[in-house]
């Protein structure tokens, strides 16, 4: 049973937990930094004094976000167009960041992702390949590019990847994402043991239900306006999390205060994974018939401009 009074017992506190200037002198790169959780992380970093680079494919949105962050925080935030699936573009972007800030990032947050809910038998090879290319291969591209530069320059860095509890538990209807995020978590643990000798550390944050327009817009069709409320009912604390709560945790992990934290996967989900096995909506989605799946497929097809998801 979910808590009936989350405002009293589990209040939301979105203000930064670290002191002002805690990340001063750091250069932070946040992939997928234009919206949602990535935007919240970038905003918190800027508030704490870091010089922030946000990267994604849509430059117009990035420019809007960077301007908003600088206006809100008085900090530094620069947008960079980068497709993490393209290793050459990733390398070029790191060159631009180095030129802009005088060094490569001290902090990397792998937040860029792709996902949608769909019955697995309806997925084309292109559909699951696209998710794997973004979430797993893209994250590897960015992480290894930073790692090589740190090793060459003999400088350290903190890398935090945003994953999900279903990377460990598995979950129906989001198989490509589960496979990819599982790979990211193994990458995190593996590089923590291999590259610590070079001054790099690697951790991951696994958020529970965090309603954002970008991520939830990819997952659910426009008709599912009750999803957020249903998520609250499925959480022991009786509420969803906020992007700012994730941002606070990521900032703390990325700071020098947590230099001994390495190779750790942290769940920030209000106890969600223990409440219903890490799959927030599995039982609900199993009730969908073929007509409903067809409607969802049409929504995804219209959003991507492709014939099949």
Curated annotation (Swiss-Prot):
Question: What is one Gene Ontology biological process annotated in the Swiss-Prot or TrEMBL record?
Answer: fatty acid beta-oxidation
**First-tier enzyme category under EC:** oxidoreductase
Covalent S-S links between cysteines? none
Q: Which residues form the active site?
A: 166 (proton acceptor)
Provide the catalytic activity annotation.
a (2E,4E)-dienoyl-CoA + NADPH + H(+) = a 4,5-saturated-(3E)-enoyl-CoA + NADP(+); a (2E,4Z)-dienoyl-CoA + NADPH + H(+) = a 4,5-saturated-(3E)-enoyl-CoA + NADP(+)
Any keyword Transcription? no
Positions binding substrate in this chain are: 57, 116, 124, 218
- Leader sequence segment: none
Which Pfam families has this protein been placed in? adh_short_C2
Listed binding positions for NADP(+) are 32-37, 57, 83, 181, 207-210
Report the domain of life of the source organism: Eukaryota
Please indicate if the UniProt record lists Cell membrane as a keyword. no
Q: Which GO terms describe its cellular component?
A: mitochondrion
Cross-referenced InterPro entries: NAD(P)-bd_dom_sf, SDR_fam
Q: Which PANTHER family match?
A: 17-BETA-HYDROXYSTEROID DEHYDROGENASE 14-RELATED (PTHR43658:SF8), SHORT-CHAIN DEHYDROGENASE/REDUCTASE (PTHR43658)
The family assignment reads: Belongs to the short-chain dehydrogenases/reductases (SDR) family. 2,4-dienoyl-CoA reductase subfamily.
Q: What does this protein do?
A: Auxiliary enzyme of beta-oxidation. It participates in the metabolism of unsaturated fatty enoyl-CoA esters having double bonds in both even- and odd-numbered positions. Catalyzes the NADP-dependent reduction of 2,4-dienoyl-CoA to yield trans-3-enoyl-CoA.
Q: Would you tell me the protein name for this molecule?
A: Probable 2,4-dienoyl-CoA reductase 3 [(3E)-enoyl-CoA-producing]
- Source organism per UniProt: Caenorhabditis elegans
């Amino acid at each position: 049973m979910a808590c009936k009074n989350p405002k009293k017992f589990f209040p939301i506190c979105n203000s930064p937990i670290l002191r002002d200037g805690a990340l001063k002198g750091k250069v932070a790169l946040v992939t997928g930094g234009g919206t949602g959780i990535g935007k919240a992380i970038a905003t918190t970093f800027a508030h704490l004094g870091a010089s922030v680079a946000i990267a994604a494919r849509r430059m117009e949105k990035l420019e809007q976000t960077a301007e908003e962050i600088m206006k809100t925080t008085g900090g530094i935030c620069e947008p960079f167009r980068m497709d993490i699936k393209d290793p050459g573009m990733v390398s070029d972007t790191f060159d631009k960041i180095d030129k802009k800030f005088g060094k490569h990032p001290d902090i990397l947050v792998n937040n860029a992702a792709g996902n949608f809910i769909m019955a697995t038998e309806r997925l084309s090879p292109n559909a699951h390949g696209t998710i794997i290319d973004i979430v797993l291969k893209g994250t590897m591209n960015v992480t290894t590019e930073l790692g090589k530069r740190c090793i060459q320059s003999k400088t350290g860095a903190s890398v935090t990847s945003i994953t999900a509890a279903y990377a460990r538990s598995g979950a129906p209807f989001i198989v490509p994402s589960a496979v990819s995020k599982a790979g990211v978590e193994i990458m995190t643990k593996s590089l923590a043991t291999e590259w610590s000798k070079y001054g790099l550390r690697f951790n991951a944050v696994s958020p529970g239900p965090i309603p954002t327009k970008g991520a939830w817009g990819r997952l659910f069709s426009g008709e599912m306006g009750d999803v957020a409320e249903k998520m609250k009912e499925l959480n022991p604390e009786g509420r969803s999390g906020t992007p700012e709560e994730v941002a606070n945790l990521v900032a703390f992990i990325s700071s020098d205060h947590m230099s001994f934290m390495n190779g750790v996967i942290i769940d920030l989900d209000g106890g969600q994974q223990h409440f219903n096995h890490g799959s927030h909506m599995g039982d609900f989605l199993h009730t969908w018939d073929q007509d409903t799946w067809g409607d969802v497929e049409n929504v995804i097809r219209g959003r991507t401009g492709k014939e099949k998801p």
